[in-house]
Amino acid sequence: MNNSMINPAITDLLKKVDNRYSLVVVTSKRARQLVDGDEALLESDIVKPVSLAIEEVNDGLISYETIREGIK
């Protein structure tokens, strides 16, 4: 049983992305898109953009690409 107060739990969200940094970046960029007027990818009563973005990540509705270019 997961005793996290955050729903969904961070451990569950980390199964959808590469690492914590990616989770923060993907979630924040998606939340910004929602604030700027993009339509939600799921039907929900959630009104907070960050909470909605987290749910979209958890449901596997958000994809991203990791670019592995370093400083040259």
Curated annotation (Swiss-Prot):
EC number assigned by the record: 2.7.7.6
Biological source species: Clostridium tetani (strain Massachusetts / E88)
Cellular component annotations (GO), alphabetically ordered: DNA-directed RNA polymerase complex
Function of the molecule: Promotes RNA polymerase assembly. Latches the N- and C-terminal regions of the beta' subunit thereby facilitating its interaction with the beta and alpha subunits.
Annotated keywords: DNA-directed RNA polymerase, Nucleotidyltransferase, Transcription, Transferase
UniProt protein name: DNA-directed RNA polymerase subunit omega
Subunit (UniProt): The RNAP catalytic core consists of 2 alpha, 1 beta, 1 beta' and 1 omega subunit. When a sigma factor is associated with the core the holoenzyme is formed, which can initiate transcription.
Record-stated family: Belongs to the RNA polymerase subunit omega family.
The keyword Hydrolase belongs to this UniProt entry's keyword annotation: no
Keyword Transcription: yes
SMART domains registered for this protein in UniProt: RNA_pol_Rpb6
Top-level EC class as recorded in UniProt: transferase
BP-aspect Gene Ontology terms: DNA-templated transcription
Catalytic activity entry: RNA(n) + a ribonucleoside 5'-triphosphate = RNA(n+1) + diphosphate
Pfam families noted in UniProt: RNA_pol_Rpb6
GO molecular function, one term: DNA-directed RNA polymerase activity
